[in-house]
């Protein structure tokens, strides 16, 4: 018999908000009696944008900006219906992107 598993991937630009959200999910799942693996930190994506400082000249003078996307992975092993219901009711910040795979 195959074990049922829910995999949750969290993404956010702010790692403090991401860690708080992951902690909320882990506490909620443990309260309902399911096993949790994680949160596992995944590699951070770093996007770098280079633009010219001046609108007309000085190609040598440039400025760089970056956006870091932090990611976490949480596995819920053998979830109960109570676990799924508690996760549906969980209120997480708007800055955290959540992907759930069954």
Swiss-Prot record:
GO terms for biological process: translation. InterPro entries: Ribosomal_uS10 (IPR001848), Ribosomal_uS10_CS (IPR018268), Ribosomal_uS10_dom (IPR027486), Ribosomal_uS10_dom_sf (IPR036838). Pfam families: Ribosomal_S10. SMART domains: Ribosomal_S10. The keyword tRNA processing does not apply. The keyword Signal does not apply. Involved in the binding of tRNA to the ribosomes. Belongs to the universal ribosomal protein uS10 family. This is Small ribosomal subunit protein uS10. It comes from Desulforudis audaxviator (strain MP104C). The lineage of its organism: Bacteria, Bacillati, Bacillota, Clostridia, Thermoanaerobacterales.
